[in-house]
Amino acid sequence: MLAVFGHLNPDTDAISAAMVYARLLTRQGTEAQAYRLGEPNFETAYVLRELGLEAPPLLTELPAGSKVALVDHNESAQSLPALGELDVTRVVDHHKLGDLTTINPPYLRFEPVGCTGTILLKLHREAGLSVEPQDAKLMLSAILSDTLHFRSPTTTQDDRDAVAFLAPVAGVNDVEAYALAMFAAKSDLGNTPAETLLRMDYKVFPFGDPVQPQNWGIGVIETTNPAYVFGRQQELLAAMDQVKAEDTLSGMLLSVVDILNETNRTLVLGATEAKVLREAFGAEAEGQVADLGNRISRKKQIVPTLEKYFAPEA
């Protein structure tokens, strides 16, 4: 049985892609099972409730040599521990190629689109297989989530075309209303502990020297209610300090993205982070908050800028 899973701290695309791809592979004759590497966030939980589905089983480890398929990620820091000991047979992703190494030649499908769901729709078409309504809604939800309903600069025409095709198959007549309902669920943070908020959409990235990299943790909270998040600023800064120590990081950032206004204000933990934001982005931290303007995409606008900043001198 092939294990299919997305990244740690899974978002809607990571969980939806695992579920859809596992079913697609099974329909094509490869027995596959979807898994998750963490708890679904509030938005993903809403999508699953809408569909009457349970989240995939939680996966914490696999025996060395187990065959796996990765979706929505390919970097070891964002995946199952000891990924290098597993037989990665397939990767379907829309991120840059990271440090992935494999035991055997894998099937790779990378495309510069806004969401793995967009690629999975293409795989259905290429296989000559119909898209089931349940899978259509999972892919639709993932694309709306990853692209912030086309607000993100990662959005491509392929993503727009995919949504136009998937919405009627999924039975979603008003895409805007459905997207807003998803974002409202994502923003309903209630009394969630600060560290949980921080880790909901949190990834570790190695920058600089590949032999001795600087590992930075970059969290994102996408919300329609940023005032609530900043009302808990001191709690979040304390959680950032704790996570920075726990994960042995060189730096820690938390971007609070206002979905509707398409702005990013980032919490700045200390002097190290303030210096990097000033020199890399030209953003000054005031009251431990830096205004990063319309840089709302970690993948396309934050991480590449930091990679360039930390790049070793030739």
UniProtKB/Swiss-Prot annotation:
Q: Which domain of life is it from?
A: Bacteria
Record: residues binding Mn(2+) 2? 13, 72, 94, 146
Q: Name one GO cellular component term.
A: cytoplasm
* One example GO MF annotation: inorganic diphosphate phosphatase activity
Q: Which residues cross the membrane?
A: none
Q: Which reaction does it catalyse?
A: diphosphate + H2O = 2 phosphate + H(+)
Q: Which Gene3D superfamilies match?
A: DHHA2 domain (3.10.310.20), inorganic pyrophosphatase (n-terminal core) (3.90.1640.10)
Q: Where in the cell is it found?
A: Cytoplasm
The entry's keywords: Cytoplasm, Hydrolase, Manganese, Metal-binding
Identify which top EC class this enzyme belongs to: hydrolase
Required cofactors, per record? Mn(2+)
Under the heading InterPro entries, the entry gives: DDH_dom, DHH_sf, DHHA2, DHHA2_dom_sf, Mn-dep_inorganic_PyrPase
The free-text cofactor remark is:
Binds 2 manganese ions per subunit.
Q: Which residues bind Mn(2+) 1?
A: 7, 11, 72
Q: Could you tell me the EC number(s) of this protein?
A: 3.6.1.1
UniProt miscellaneous comment: On the 2D-gel the determined pI of this protein is: 4.65, its MW is: 32 kDa.
Give the family per the record: Belongs to the PPase class C family.
Q: Which HAMAP family match?
A: PPase_C
Q: What is this protein called?
A: Probable manganese-dependent inorganic pyrophosphatase
Q: Which organism is it from?
A: Deinococcus radiodurans (strain ATCC 13939 / DSM 20539 / JCM 16871 / CCUG 27074 / LMG 4051 / NBRC 15346 / NCIMB 9279 / VKM B-1422 / R1)
Q: What is the lineage of its organism?
A: Bacteria, Thermotogati, Deinococcota, Deinococci, Deinococcales
